[in-house]
């Protein structure tokens, strides 16, 4: 059952020009990203059959974010978020063209260097895109906007990965890189059409970047709900090594080397298609209240573990694709709903730094997870199926943590206590108590 204030995807895009242009830019840019990813994976597998070589590419895609996020968060909260996104797109256009020189050289370090630069620029773009959404979308439409953004990522993953596999197989790696570079130009053009009407961001010019990070650190300590919400994607990233595992499992189940690029594309398409339906189904059948979002996240961690057990027992491309799709279906619920809850719980002046913090910790955990997959395959001699089994066990841990934290907070609220700014009478919807008891609870809070 949906809320009265709920809005559909098509209506949101039709009525909100600014968000529509942001969304168009996302569609084009992410299509190119997945073309790029499939081309890079195929190139590395052509140069090396080492699990660590693939893990190195994944770490090059992830770890630069950890180093760049402290700078990016401050920049996003100080400078026009629209300007940050356009500059990032234009610079990435130049960097991606550098991949055209890699195939002839056949040097892994050059691939890693280009990936590091490209991802560092993405470290500015993604927090800016996340932080600008509340200034373009009314509060009551934030869950829909986040669900649409998450579903778009999923569709572009499915379509872009499949297209990438076809393009690389038929036209070669160079064509995929050229198309990817052009998508950044188109994305920048769409974003340039967004009117500069962001909400004012508080800028204390006397503060340096370090002081501003201390400020947001104090905010997160005082607001444990926001802190834990910003760590949920890191919990999801515990099993992020699936990014390294997918190409390795594709090679394991496909006997023909000529089918490898297409097989990787199929698996990543399954990953994208699965992620489309998670938030959509929850929103359609259960609504989008904060309580629904909270418990959907908890359930999704445990259901994701079940899907990884299925992956661990897969022996062909189609059952493997089904397991990957199921895993990302539940992962998308965690991703989209945690972002929406952060938007609803965090003042605008902190959003850039909070999303940068979230991205930094998540990518650090994901980088470690991908390195762990490569190490387990190369050094420990584990099979891809055995690694997937360990992932199934690990993803249960953040689910237990979130369930325990949620139970603790709701118990405190039932007792009339506050947890940060979340109080028994809480407009964010964390309040688990019936409205008829508001007067009784408010009196209890005042007495304390």
Regions found by a protein language model. Give the residues of each.
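Substrate-agnostic recognition of the 12-TM MFS/MFS-like secondary transporter fold
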Residues: 20-38, 58-76, 80-95, 110-169, ...
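Small-residue hotspots at the loop-to-helix junctions and early N-terminal turns
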Residues: 36-39, 43, 48-55, 147, ...
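Helix-loop junctions on the cytosolic side of multi-pass membrane transporters
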Residues: 131, 135, 173, 177-207, ...
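Primarily residues marking transmembrane-helix entry/exit sites
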Residues: 15-23, 51, 108-112, 212, ...
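Juxtamembrane intracellular "pre-TM" segments in multi-pass secondary transporters
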Residues: 2-20, 197-231, 438
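Transmembrane alpha-helix termini and helix-breaking/packing motifs in multi-pass membrane transporters
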Residues: 38-48, 99-102, 159-179, 252-254, ...
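MFS-fold secondary transporters
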Residues: 36, 45, 98-102, 118, ...
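C-terminal transmembrane bundle of multi-pass solute transporters/carriers
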Residues: 57, 67, 78, 84, ...
């Amino acid at each position: 059952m949906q809320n009265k204030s709920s809005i559909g995807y098509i209506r949101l895009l039709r009525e909100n020009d600014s968000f529509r242009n942001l969304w168009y830019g996302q569609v084009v840019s992410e299509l190119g990203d997945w073309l790029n990813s499939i081309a890079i994976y195929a190139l590395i597998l052509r140069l090396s059959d080492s699990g660590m070589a693939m893990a190195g590419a994944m770490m090059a895609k992830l770890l630069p974010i950890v180093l760049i996020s402290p700078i990016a968060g401050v920049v996003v909260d100080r400078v026009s978020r629209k300007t940050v996104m356009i500059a990032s797109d234009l610079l990435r256009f130049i960097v991606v063209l550098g991949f055209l020189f890699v195939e002839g050289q056949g040097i892994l370090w050059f691939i890693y260097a280009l990936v590091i630069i490209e991802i560092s620029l993405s470290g500015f773009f993604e927090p800016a895109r996340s932080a600008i959404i509340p200034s373009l979308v009314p509060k009551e439409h934030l869950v829909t906007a986040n669900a649409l953004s998450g579903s778009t990522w999923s569709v572009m993953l499915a379509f872009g990965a499949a297209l990438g596999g076809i393009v690389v197989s038929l036209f070669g790696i160079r064509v995929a890189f050229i198309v990817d570079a052009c998508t950044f130009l188109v994305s920048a053009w769409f974003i340039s059409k967004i009117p500069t009407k962001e909400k004012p961001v508080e800028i204390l010019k006397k503060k340096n970047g370090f002081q501003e990070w201390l400020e947001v650190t104090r905010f997160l300590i005082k607001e444990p709900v926001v802190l834990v919400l910003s760590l949920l994607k890191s919990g999801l990233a515990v099993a992020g090594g699936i990014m390294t595992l997918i190409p390795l499992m594709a090679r394991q189940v496909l006997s023909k080397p000529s089918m490898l690029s297409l097989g990787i594309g199929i698996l990543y398409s399954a990953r994208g298609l699965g992620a489309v339906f998670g938030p959509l189904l929850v929103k359609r059948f259960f609504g989008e209240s904060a309580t629904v979002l909270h418990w959907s996240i908890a359930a999704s961690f445990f259901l994701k573990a079940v899907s990884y057990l299925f992956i661990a027992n897969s022996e062909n491309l189609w059952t493997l694709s089904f397991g990957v799709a199921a895993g990302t279906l539940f992962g998308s619920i965690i991703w989209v709903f945690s972002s929406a809850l952060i938007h609803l719980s965090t003042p605008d002046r902190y959003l850039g730094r909070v999303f940068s913090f979230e991205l930094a910790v998540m990518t650090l955990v994901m980088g470690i997870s991908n390195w762990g997959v490569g190490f387990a395959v190369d050094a420990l001699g584990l099979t891809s199926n055995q690694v997937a089994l360990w992932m199934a066990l690990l993803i249960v841990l953040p689910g237990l943590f979130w369930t325990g934290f949620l139970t603790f907070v709701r118990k405190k609220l039932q007792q009339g206590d506050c947890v940060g700014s979340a109080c028994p009478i809480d407009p964010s919807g964390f309040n688990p108590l019936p409205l008829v008891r508001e007067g009784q609870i408010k009196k209890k809070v005042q007495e304390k």
